Amino acid sequence: MNTESAASTADRLRAAVHWLLPTRLLSRLTWHVARSPRPWLKNRLNRFLVRRYGLDLSEAEHSDPTAYPTFYALFTRALRPGARPLPEDPQALISPCDGTVSAVGHLHGERLIQAKGIEYSLRGLLHGLDPAPFRDGAFVTIYLSPRDYHRFHAPVAGRLQAERHVPGRLLTVAPSAVRAIRGLFLRNERHVTLWETVVGLVAVVPVGAVNVGSIETVWGGPVGEAPGLSRDFGPGEGVFLGRGEELGRFNLGSTVVVVLPAGVVRWADGLVAGRPVRMGEVLGRLRRADAR
């Protein structure tokens, strides 16, 4: 099991301050400002974003930050075609997003590791969906900072079997908060998706954060517009996504958790907490569920 280091006193102090912030109000204000098309506002914000966080737009659809119609459009920018060629190995599990690995390893029964010394419940994360297929399975958690590309993609080809929108807090998911706030991913808004794949069910769970009040999926749009959304799909009914196809997007920094069944993935050498990853990068190698 590989996780970030334990919480420091500074981490706990930052978390305590963050608890006092009106995060949902801040997210609503950010939502309106980020979608303003006024050139004087959005161009200043977009240039500030590039300077403040060092955004690399060389792979983006537009390399000029003022070419984006809104601040939100820059944050949720698309990559230009061909910017991220996928690995030729059909058994490669790819990173669903750009970001930094905050935890990777295997479940202890139905328990995942959030950070050093902090576990949380898979049953709680899935919010009513059956955790049994993932018992003693594998997981990886990837944090997206404000500078990262903010769309997330299918780590393996699959058909959507179920989805659940879970309303919740919008606490920061920055590394300091992950180390300090127990059950952080269970407290925050998230959208649980289960995918039927060649290795069995795979869960992909985008987790919201402060300023990230609107998780979107490519098949349903902003999921926050249907709080408590709960849908199950019969054979052949759910959307099918090929490996690397866009699954959704969200604004500002957030987190994606991927959970797999036991025995179906061998993590790549060097995949450890703190390592930067890019969408399309190989995280591990899969083997079919029936080959175990």
Curated annotation (Swiss-Prot):
Enzyme's top EC category: lyase
Residues bearing the modification Pyruvic acid (Ser): S254
Active-site residues, as the UniProt record annotates them: D98 (charge relay system), H153 (charge relay system), S254 (charge relay system), S254 (schiff-base intermediate with substrate)
Alphabetic keyword roster: Cell membrane, Decarboxylase, Lipid biosynthesis, Lipid metabolism, Lyase, Membrane, Phospholipid biosynthesis, Phospholipid metabolism, Pyruvate, Zymogen
Pathway noted in the entry: Phospholipid metabolism; phosphatidylethanolamine biosynthesis; phosphatidylethanolamine from CDP-diacylglycerol: step 2/2
Cofactor: pyruvate
GO molecular function, one term: phosphatidylserine decarboxylase activity
Complexes and interactors: Heterodimer of a large membrane-associated beta subunit and a small pyruvoyl-containing alpha subunit.
Protein name: Phosphatidylserine decarboxylase proenzyme
Lineage of producing organism: Bacteria, Pseudomonadati, Pseudomonadota, Gammaproteobacteria, Chromatiales
